[in-house]
Structures are given as structure tokens and as C-alpha cells.
Design a protein with these regions (language model features):
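Long, charged low-complexity segments
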Residues: 43, 48-110
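Charged alpha-helical initiation segments
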Residues: 1-23
């Protein structure tokens, strides 16, 4: 499925709404979806097979992609983190900020 920046912006609205009412889980999910959509848009123009085919694959791959700046990789790593996984120390305590960091970078390289 092809997504547009309008789809990304709509998902960001859901993210902001969920975060505002204190639904952190829904906010993290919306952040991952928004970032996944944006990466998908970027991959249409710049195919990278190693990124896989799902939003979570996209975000996980971005977390270790050396071509991305360290702050973007860190934001992606935190968005991949699960609060219920004690082995993983990095998880997003501010999914809005992490999503915005990644989305701003993707928009800048379009």
C-alpha cells in the first residue's frame, strides 16, 4: 500500500491526541505507524531491500542504519523498545518527540 504525507500527518494527529489524554501505548503505536509510513514514502524513491516490508521492520532497520544521523537512529531505537521487555533498556518515554525527530529528518532528505 502506498502512503502519502497526508496519511503521515493524520497518524501524527492520532499520536498527539493519544498522548494528550495519557494513552502512552496508543501514542507509541501511532508514532511507529507515522514513522513507518514516512519511511515507506522515502523507500519508494530510494529502494533499500534491507528495510524489509513492514512498519516495524522499517523502524528497526533505521535504528541501526549508519547513513542516518545518531539522533535519528536513537529515536528509532527507542520507538522499537517495549516497556514490558526488561532486557531492552531503550524505550520511548516521549514518542511524539522521537517521531518528530525522525519525520523531520525524512522530510529533509526527500
Amino acid at each position: 500500500m502506498q502512503y502519502t504525507w497526508e496519511d503521515v500527518d493524520n497518524e501524527v494527529k492520532l499520536l498527539r491526541s493519544a498522548w494528550k489524554i495519557g494513552n502512552a501505548g496508543k501514542a507509541r503505536t501511532a508514532a511507529r505507524r507515522a514513522v513507518g509510513m514516512a519511511i515507506g514514502i522515502w523507500l519508494e524513491k530510494h529502494p533499500r531491500p534491507e528495510y524489509g516490508s513492514s512498519f516495524m521492520n522499517f523502524v528497526e532497520t533505521l535504528s541501526w542504519d549508519e547513513s542516518a544521523p545518531p539522533n535519528v537512529r536513537g529515536a528509532a531505537e527507542r520507538l522499537c523498545g517495549k516497556t514490558s521487555d526488561p532486557r531492552k533498556t531503550a524505550f520511548s518515554i516521549d514518542p511524539m518527540e522521537d517521531a518528530e525527530t525522525i519525520l523531520d529528518w525524512i522530510r529533509s532528505i526527500q
